[in-house]
Amino acid sequence: MNTDAQSTSNTRNFMYSPDSSLEVVIITNSDGDHDGYLELTAAAKVMSPFLSNGSSAVWTNAAPSHKLIKNNKNYIHVFGLFKYLSNYNLNNKKRPKEYYTLKSIISDLLMGAQGKVFDPLCEVKTQLCAIQESLNEAISILNVHSNDAAANPPAPDINKLQELIQDLQSEYNKKITFTTDTILENLKNIKDLMCLNK
């Protein structure tokens, strides 16, 4: 168990989400060789979706060489984090946000510095860009459909069908008129016959 670093070490805070600042210790052994440790309670919180038997097991199950105690705080080495991420089922398409946070933490601890500093407005900007992109696509699709409708008159087949329907309607109206006239004439004849019989 490491109680103090034999090389250069410093405690830093890495930002990964709007409400979480994670305390880390970076030990620089030589140029390009770093050992990164994450504070235990932060590690347990980030890894909670991957833990089956609770957060206390993180410290208990860590190898002695993966433990660091500094300023009365417990830290776990980046290799100890790998163990939990390696057990995650990658076939699960709906991944918790902690999955991505843990991957970023592991990457940053291996490099010895935070690679991509969290921008609190980044997610909002990304969502606004996605909304704007969707709106632009919808507008362009509507414009294409509108231009197609204005530029393309109805197809000749549709015009022929419309003429046929109008002809059939006209013919039907004539037949109805003829039938109605015939019925009225027959009624008049029946009435006349009835009047004559009286």
From Swiss-Prot:
Record's GO cellular component terms: host cell cytoplasm; host cell nucleus; viral capsid
Assigned protein family: Belongs to the baculoviridae p24 family.
Organism: Autographa californica nuclear polyhedrosis virus (AcMNPV)
Protein name as it appears in the record: Capsid protein p24
Subcellular location: Virion; Host cytoplasm; Host nucleus
Transit peptide is among the record's keywords: no
Superkingdom to which the source organism belongs: Viruses
Record bears the keyword Nucleotide-binding: no
Keywords: Capsid protein, Host cytoplasm, Host nucleus, Late protein, Virion
Additional record remark: Expressed late in infection.
Annotated signal sequence range: none
